């Protein structure tokens, strides 16, 4: 991964891995008890409790909320540490630029309406601090006639792939050496006018493997990246 970055084939690579966990609950029971922004369950396959929006469509506008930057919120001054970390600043800027370009393919007058705002996610192990941005574009009047094309044109989500997207996807496939399946795909609800969708992260498979990951850049430290991946392994049952 670092070699591909060093020779300029990618600026940001979202690398993921599996962690074996033990639970007294089935994934269906976890779904019924999970407390998360988005929950998704596919029988005999997976349960997902994602904090990340993929895109929203409302009143003819499309919004994306790339999430890049994670920290254990119990660390003293965690918010400022995360917001001032140069690696995280660079990673987030790369992702915002990628998503802005993605939205420009399906909408007009694209702009960043919120940049690097901090939120906390509650887990049994303690809170996680995460940083997101909001990007907005204006859709064509007849956008609902091509909603499928719009979504597929934005896939895969930038936050779980990297930049440049297609080359980075190829690097990820070679490094992970395993199909992600449903993991890091999207799910959502569309009523014919408005859409709300999520990226399938914070993901537990029926075989007991939990999948998590993070963004790798030229400034990444292996131990810090490993710790971030472990911090993201949690089941939000309270």
What are these regions (language model features)?
Residues 1-238:
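Extended alpha-helical targeting/anchoring segments
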């Amino acid at each position: 991964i670092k070699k591909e970055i060093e020779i300029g084939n990618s600026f940001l690579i979202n690398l993921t891995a599996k962690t074996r966990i033990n639970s007294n609950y089935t994934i269906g029971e976890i779904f019924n008890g999970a407390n998360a922004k988005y929950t998704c369950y596919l029988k005999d396959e997976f349960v997902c409790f994602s904090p990340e929006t993929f895109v929203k469509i409302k009143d003819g506008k499309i919004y994306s909320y790339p999430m890049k930057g994670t920290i254990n919120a119990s660390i003293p001054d965690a918010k400022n540490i995360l917001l001032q970390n140069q690696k995280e600043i660079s990673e987030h800027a790369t992702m915002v630029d990628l998503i802005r370009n993605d939205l420009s393919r399906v909408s007009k007058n694209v702009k960043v309406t919120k940049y690097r705002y901090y939120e906390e996610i509650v887990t049994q192990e303690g809170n996680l601090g995460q940083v997101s941005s909001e990007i907005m574009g204006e859709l064509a009047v007849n956008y609902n006639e091509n909603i499928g094309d719009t979504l597929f044109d934005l896939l895969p989500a930038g936050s779980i792939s990297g930049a440049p997207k297609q080359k980075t996807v190829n690097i990820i496939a070679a490094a992970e050496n395993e199909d992600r399946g449903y993991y890091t795909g999207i799910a959502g609800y569309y009523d014919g006018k408005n859409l709300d969708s999520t990226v399938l992260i914070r993901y537990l498979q029926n075989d007991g493997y939990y999948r998590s990951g993070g963004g790798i850049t030229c400034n990444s430290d292996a131990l810090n990246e490993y710790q971030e991946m472990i911090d993201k392994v949690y089941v939000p049952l309270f």
